[in-house]
UniProtKB/Swiss-Prot annotation:
Formation of pseudouridine at positions 38, 39 and 40 in the anticodon stem and loop of transfer RNAs. Pfam families: PseudoU_synth_1. The gene is truA. Substrate binds at Y109. This is tRNA pseudouridine synthase A.
Length: 262
C-alpha cells in the first residue's frame, strides 16, 4: 500500500531535508522513525526538498508500506520515534501512481521578515530580519512583475540542478502585519534558492536601493550576479505542494501561519 504523509518541521538544527552521508537531515529522521514502526527499512520521497534552516508547515512525502499497519501507527507511532522539531500530521493511503513530487502541479512558500532595529529574540530562527525601514508599496509593485512565465536564472543558485530555469509564477505577494512583512509565492516549481533570492531582491527595492522595475531588468539579463544576495533561510517556510482534488489529500490551508498572519 502506498501511503502519503503530511509533515511539519522546524528546519533549525537540521541539514535540510535530503538524506546525506553524515545524517542530521529531516529525511534521515523520518526514515529512521518509519523503520522503527515497520521493523524494516523504509524510504520516502518528498514533494519539495528544503535547505538547512528552512521550515515546512505542510511537506508531503510518500512511501510504499512494507508491512500492514493501521494509519494511526504511521502518525502516532512514527511521532514517538521522531526528534523534537519534526511531526507527522496525517497519513493517508493513495493510489499506486501517486508521487509526492511529480503529482504536484505547484508549490507554495512563505517568508516571514521581521522589520525593526532590534534583532529577533523570541522569533530567533523562525523569521528573517532586516533593520532598515521598508516601503511596502514598492515591494508590492515589484511582485506584480514576477507573475507569469519567466526565465528566473537571475534568482537561481549556481549549483541548481533544475533542467530549465523557466517557471510559471501564479502568486507573488507581500503584505505587512505590524512589524512583520509576509511574502507569499506560488509557482509550478522553484529553482534552488529562488525564494530567498527573490526576497533579498525585494528587500533592496523596499529600502530604496533599487526601483520596482529592477525586477524586469533582472529577468531580462538572466544574470545572478546582478541581483541581490541570497537572504537568510530562517524565515522561509515550505507551505506545501498543490495537488489536483482527485488525489483526495488534506487541505494544507489550516496551518498556524494562516491563523496568525491575516
Amino acid at each position: 500500500m502506498r501511503v502519503a504523509l503530511g509533515i511539519e518541521y522546524c528546519g533549525t538544527g537540521f541539514h535540510g531535508w535530503q538524506s546525506q552521508a553524515g545524517g542530521g537531515t529531516v529525511q534521515d529522521a523520518l526514515e529512521a522513525a518509519l523503520g522503527e514502526v515497520a521493523g524494516v527499512p523504509v524510504g520516502v520521497l518528498c514533494a519539495g526538498r528544503t535547505d538547512a534552516g528552512v521550515h515546512a508547515t505542510h511537506q508531503v512525502a510518500h512511501f510504499d508500506a512494507p508491512v500492514d499497519r493501521p494509519l494511526t501507527a504511521w502518525v502516532r507511532g512514527v511521532n514517538s520515534h521522531l526528534p523534537e522539531g519534526v511531526a507527522v500530521r496525517w497519513a493517508q493511503p493513495v493510489a499506486e501512481d501517486f508521487h509526492a513530487r511529480f503529482s504536484a502541479r505547484g508549490r507554495r512558500y512563505r517568508y516571514l521578515l521581521l522589520n525593526r532595529p532590534q534583532r529577533p529574540g523570541l522569533w530567533q530562527g523562525r523569521v528573517g530580519w532586516f533593520h532598515w525601514p521598508l516601503e511596502l508599496e514598492a515591494m508590492q509593485e515589484a511582485c506584480l512583475r514576477l507573475l507569469g512565465e519567466h526565465d528566473f536564472s537571475a534568482f537561481r543558485a549556481a549549483n541548481c540542478q533544475a533542467k530549465s530555469p523557466v517557471k510559471h509564477m501564479s502568486r507573488a505577494e507581500v503584505r505587512q502585519c505590524g512589524n512583520m512583512f509576509v511574502f507569499d509565492f506560488e509557482a509550478s516549481a522553484f529553482l534552488h534558492h529562488m525564494v530567498r533570492n527573490l526576497v533579498g531582491t525585494l528587500v533592496y527595492i523596499g529600502k530604496g536601493t533599487q526601483q520596482p522595475d529592477w525586477i524586469e531588468a533582472l529577468l531580462q539579463t538572466k544574470d545572478r550576479k546582478l541581483a541581490a544576495p541570497t537572504f537568510s533561510p530562517d524565515g522561509l517556510y515550505f507551505r506545501g505542494p498543490v495537488y489536483e482534488p482527485h488525489w483526495g489529500l488534506p487541505d494544507p490551508n489550516d496551518d498556524f501561519l494562516d491563523g496568525m498572519l491575516k
